């Protein structure tokens, strides 16, 4: 199949993204790192972060080799899988890990430079931190599109099939590299989350509550580990998470597009449907770069003004991609291009609404978080109760928003043909519309991820300023940047969860297409439906497959899968919460030991052993991340082998529905507890050191693993289970008990 000229826009956009990422990195490196003390602290954090990442990549590499060998056996030995899968799996993991490495390397160099820039002005500090965060955003989208372009070119050259089926095979094969990205992302998120929260909880409980010293105080032995953790969890982890969503949404939509137009036999239209999500993402990169340059602020800006500064860039990029979608789909000549353009807009609007809802429930500018701070007057128990209640209530808007986005994207794609919305052609086109909505939501990831990666950079800059003893004016500026970072981080988590839900739904639909390929690969060409009718596998609709495998709520295997999927979210959260608890216990004991045995720490005369705390967090994270992460891979395989395709569909639906709601609850409750504590630290209800402050520190400590370990990891869990099911579809079709 000839490569159309317009395709080359996709790799070109990825190169542009990487070039600008390199440019922003070089600009950041030219900034002065400040005093000798600031350089020393930054070096400690950088050394700890890189040591952790090296150790994590060693462990993950072993797991990747084992899985790649297993996939190679399935492909070349058992013959139940596409021969390209082992290689696609490895490249997905490699590029995901590479994105995390570059993002974290940039963040560890940027923190001291941001603190030093804040000595000049608030605007200067904001620009250094935000453009350093933009390196992460642009590296993720650049490497993502580069990987997609690479595999499209390779498979187009080597897949020896003609006709519409060629694009179906290419897109479903490309989808499997998402499992590599998902696996890498889960280890990065879970391991990073355990690391950062073990350090954070240890630093807070012993430092703030017991010793009564401020946050980021150099006398606290866990403070360097805490700062390392911000980079490990919130930069490398978040980057890998959104890399996976970004690639997954594009690839799932391309696979749905290939399937939607395969039956019609129109290869030209089929190719356009495959290229559309890639081109929307490519144009989104350029518009994200333009938006990055619009972010600036004035001295003495309030929180609302700082949020508006970031909002200008994000909203500019989002508005332009909404307009650009019409142009892209019109030029491609896609069927119902107007409706599909509105599907893109649906995804964009859903992302914005979820972000705003998250801000409302987590920022202390609004009533829910202020009520949590107010409840601290009666102790930590009421702080916990009000935070849990607020987090549960906060699930309503995101869930309704995603529901509305799904039905609108579907109806827009089929031209609001409500009477025939489940007709085979409309079903395929409607699911493609949902996929294109997820691409729309993530199309401006270059700038939305920049606002998210900005958070830990600003947080580390504040820590550097505190530990370096910079003046109150500088600390005031870094506090303002840090407070903004807390809000953008919470908003970013909401965005990541929403995008994960839409991406997982697109992957769920793609699973059926992978079943089709699995049947053909196993030599099955005809389906004998329960009604007595027969269908060629190649021409069967999604509804035919649902009928063939008895995918109905009356089928006990579907119900069993549904319950296991719902249980997986809670089991996974329980394991990760306990992992943080165990790792934090070790950290608390170590900090207490140092306060007790190293003379002069609390008076500032002795030097804490920072390296030992870093080592404890690293060991704890590596040990504790294995069980929950491997469970996410093993359970979908086991369900497929026992309960077959119907059981897997139940598993994915149960995991998506419970995981999405639970992730929103945990992220928002944790964010609200954090900002309630920040509100009191600003002087409300007695300020720092008061009983109210201690009560909110307890709430924040409980919320830490909620918002930074378990909650964000659920995004990846629901996508990884889908990806594993897709990769194992051939195995499930060939061997299952029920």
Go through each PLM region and give its residues:
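Hydrophobic packing and interface segments
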Residues: 1-738
């Amino acid at each position: 199949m000839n490569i159309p000229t317009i395709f080359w826009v996709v790799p070109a956009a990825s190169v542009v993204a990487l070039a600008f990422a390199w440019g922003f990195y070089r600009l950041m490196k030219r900034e002065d790192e400040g005093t000798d003390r600031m350089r020393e602290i930054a070096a400690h954090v950088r050394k700890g972060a890189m040591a952790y990442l090296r150790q994590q990549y060693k462990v993950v590499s072993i797991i990747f080799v084992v899985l790649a060998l297993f996939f190679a056996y399935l492909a070349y030995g058992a013959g139940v899988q596409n021969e390209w899968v082992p290689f696609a799996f490895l490249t997905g993991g490699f590029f995901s890990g590479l994105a995390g490495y570059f993002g974290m390397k940039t963040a560890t160099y940027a923190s001291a430079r941001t603190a030093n820039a804040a000595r000049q002005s608030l605007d200067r500090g904001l620009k250094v931190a935000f453009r350093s965060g933009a390196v992460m955003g642009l590296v993720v989208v650049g490497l993502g599109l580069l990987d997609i372009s690479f595999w499209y070119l390779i498979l187009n050259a080597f897949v020896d099939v003609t006709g519409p089926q060629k694009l179906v095979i290419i897109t479903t094969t490309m989808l499997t590299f998402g499992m590599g990205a998902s696996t890498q992302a889960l280890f990065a998120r879970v391991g990073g989350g355990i690391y950062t929260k073990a350090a954070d909880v240890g630093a807070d409980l012993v430092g703030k509550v017991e010793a009564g010293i401020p946050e980021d105080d150099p006398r606290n032995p866990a403070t360097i580990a805490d700062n390392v953790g911000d980079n490990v969890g919130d930069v490398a982890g978040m980057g890998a998470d959104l890399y996976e969503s970004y690639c997954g949404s594009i690839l799932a939509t391309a696979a749905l597009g290939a399937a939607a137009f395969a039956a019609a036999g129109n290869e030209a239209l089929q190719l356009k449907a495959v290229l559309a999500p890639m081109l929307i993402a490519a144009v989104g990169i350029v518009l994200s770069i333009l938006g990055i340059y619009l972010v600036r602020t004035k001295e003495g800006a309030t929180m609302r003004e700082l949020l508006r500064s970031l909002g200008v860039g994000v909203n500019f990029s989002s508005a332009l991609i909404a307009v650009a979608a019409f142009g892209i789909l019109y030029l491609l000549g896609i069927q119902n291009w107007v409706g599909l353009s509105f599907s893109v807009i649906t995804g964009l609007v859903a992302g914005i609404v979820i972000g705003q809802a998250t801000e409302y429930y987590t920022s202390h500018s609004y009533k829910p978080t202020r009520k949590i701070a107010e409840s601290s007057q009666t102790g930590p128990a009421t702080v916990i109760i009000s935070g849990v209640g607020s987090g549960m209530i906060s699930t309503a808007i995101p869930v309704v928003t995603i529901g509305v986005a799904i039905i609108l994207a579907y109806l827009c794609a089929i031209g609001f043909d409500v009477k025939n919305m489940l007709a085979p052609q409309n079903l395929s086109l409607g699911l493609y519309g949902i996929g294109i909505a997820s691409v729309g939501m993530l199309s401006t990831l270059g700038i939305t991820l920049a606002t998210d990666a900005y958070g830990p950079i600003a947080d580390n800059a504040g820590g550097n300023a505190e530990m370096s003893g910079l003046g109150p004016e500088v600390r005031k500026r870094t506090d303002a940047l840090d407070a903004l970072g807390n809000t953008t981080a919470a908003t970013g988590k909401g965005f990541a969860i929403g995008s994960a839900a839409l991406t997982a739904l697109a992957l769920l639909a793609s699973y059926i297409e992978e079943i089709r390929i699995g049947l053909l690969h196993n030599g099955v060409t005809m389906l004998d439906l329960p009604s007595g009718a027969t269908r060629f596998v190649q021409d069967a609709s999604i509804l035919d497959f649902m009928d063939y495998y008895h995918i109905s709520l009356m089928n006990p295997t579907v119900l069993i899968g549904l319950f296991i999927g719902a249980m997986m979210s809670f089991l996974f959260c329980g394991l990760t919460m306990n992992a943080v608890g165990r790792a934090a216990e070790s950290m608390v004991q170590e900090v207490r030991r140092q306060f007790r045995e190293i003379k002069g720490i609390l008076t500032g005369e002795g030097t804490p052993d920072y390296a030992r705390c870093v080592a404890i967090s690293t060991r704890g994270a590596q040990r504790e991340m294995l069980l929950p992460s491997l469970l996410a891979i093993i359970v979908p395989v086991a369900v497929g082998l026992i309960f077959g395709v119907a059981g897997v569909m139940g598993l994915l639906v149960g995991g998506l529905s419970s995981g999405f709601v639970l992730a929103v609850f945990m992220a928002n409750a944790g964010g609200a507890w954090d900002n309630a504590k920040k509100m009191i630290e600003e002087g409300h209800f007695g300020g720092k050191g008061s009983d109210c402050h201690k009560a909110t520190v307890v709430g924040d400590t409980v919320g830490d693993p909620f918002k930074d370990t378990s909650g964000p990891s659920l995004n990846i869990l629901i996508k990884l289970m889908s990806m594993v099911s897709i990769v194992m579809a051939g195995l499930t079709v060939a061997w299952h008990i029920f």
